[in-house]
Amino acid sequence: ADANEAAYAAQEAAAAIGFSIYRTEEMAELISYMRQYNESALEGEDLRFYGFDMQRISYSMRFLKESCKELEVDTTNLQKLVEGENWSSECDLSTRIETLTQVKKELESKNGSENAIHFVDILMQHSELQTLTNADGATLRDQFMAENVQWILQQEQRNGHEKIFVTGHNSHVAKWGSFDSMGKLLSKDAACLI
């Protein structure tokens, strides 16, 4: 029964990522492996799962609000920015950017706020993408994803880990194509093997 529960939990976790391309047996197996590995891993040697896309705001907003509460940063105005899993129709883009900029400024004065600041940056990335056309938005999205992967690598390097494993849609991880995909951008960095 435990193996079945673990397999089901892994499938749920894969589905929770939100993108249908990850609702696969292979992703469920990867998550299951990570869970099993972490059960016996030494402290600091556990595997972590990060997201680098900014298309969905719900997790970034949730983690930002949790971090703000821990750091004693008021979340009242952040609460007004969202309705469920989307931006509130009550707040226009300039209000959203102004609120996020103010929260970021307050977080920058707090120790231990690096992750929270990154969540603000991701929410600002999402906001900026909404103002662009499809072609411009696709290019900028991949640029943001490359920046976010670099941020993840920096976090892991701070923990003494020199390598990360990145998975994504072929059009994003590829280093070929007519536009600067995340993979193409990262392949220009000597620290990245694509």
What residue ranges belong to the model's regions?
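Structured catalytic-domain cores with a bias toward divalent-metal coordination
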Residues: 1-194
